Amino acid sequence: MAAVVFTVVVIVASSGCMDRLGAGLSPGRRRGPPRIDKHAQTFFRGVADHGAVMNPTAQPSDPGTPSLAVPPLFAALAPARSILIAGAGGGFDVYAGLPLAFALWRGGAQVHLASLSFSELELIDREAWVAEHVAAVQPDTASPDWYFPERTLARWLAAQQLPSTVYAFPPLGVQPLRAAYRHLVEHLDVDAVVLVDGGTDVLLRGDESDLGTPVEDITSLAAVAALEVPVKLVTSLGFGIDAYDGVNHVQVLENLAALDRDGGYLGALSIPGSSREAALYRDAVADAQAATPDRPSIVQGQIAAATSGAFGDVRFSRRTRGGDLFVNPLMAIYFTVDLDKLAARCLYLDHIENTIGRRQVITRIQAFRDELLSARVPRAFPH
């Protein structure tokens, strides 16, 4: 999104500048460099003051410098040998990482999937547990629980002849969840972790007008932040969906801008609707909806609809009856940030650091909000 806005500004301003430059040049004086009038000088100075490099020849040649030609998300993951993509918010959040996983698998990367599970994991086969609080869910993992997104995904992956183990964690506090992640990192020799949020509440710092449903997202963020892993990222898919839970998305954009200034924003990356990754993702979501018809994922349903070009109040489940959805192309865009820089900006991460259980996390977040002297005022989009 930031790249699109910047491009529009440059095109419009350049067009206006060229009109003025053309008017001030006579045919016999076009060989030398054009004279820029005071209006153009003011524009370029203003852009430069905001950190943009206006002279292409002055751009640094450091190979680590981000380039429009290579999405920073993939550039950051390129050196990794073993990548763990984990659903930060629980339930079907891991599905939001599938388009990324498909692209990485296609490129030959070793990718593992994990999920903070809302299923009754205590009922699954004992042999599925590979460590305390870590279950390796396979297509044939037995459980009487009808709501089991991890097994549903494992079965779908197996049908596509893709790696079909989905690691699952029960809802926990920060300390045991960190231990579970640490086991996976060591067991799988992971050198890159990507937390994926279906929605945007993982990007909130705590002083916004509303935090949405942050418990699982922020627990995952705190758990992974303390791990020694070379690459740690957070990516959000489903911009706008959390408005249902009160999230103000102008404040989300404000947070992304602040992360950009800190060097922690890796940009936005759209999932092309006609791509193989989008087609597979839609199929996986449809399969999950068929497996859990009484509780399909509203989040993944909206994202899948967005990747197919749907717009507005799209109906795909009885669960959305009576609501007013606004499916749009922004929901099919990955917004990616550096995990450590995101964690450093969270105002209440230290409040939940020593938690053991999920209930403790809920209580600590509520206490933080109760003590907050003033929240940021929500704003409407000006356009």
Predicted regions, residues:
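Short, positively charged and aromatic/hydrophobic N-terminal segments
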Residues: 11-14, 37-38, 44, 49-50
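Positively charged, low-complexity intrinsically disordered leader regions
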Residues: 55-82
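N-terminal phosphate-binding or glycine-rich loops at protein starts, especially the Walker A/P-loop
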Residues: 77-124
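Glycine-rich nucleotide/cofactor/substrate-binding loop typically near the N-terminus or early
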Residues: 105-106, 111-168
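Acidic, Ser/Thr-rich peripheral helices and adjacent loops at domain boundaries
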Residues: 126-142, 249-269
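Internal, conserved structured core segments that host functional sites
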Residues: 164-227
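A conserved mid-domain beta-alpha-beta active-site/ligand-binding segment of alpha/beta enzyme cores
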Residues: 253-318
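C-terminal accessory domains and tails appended to enzymatic cores
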Residues: 289-383
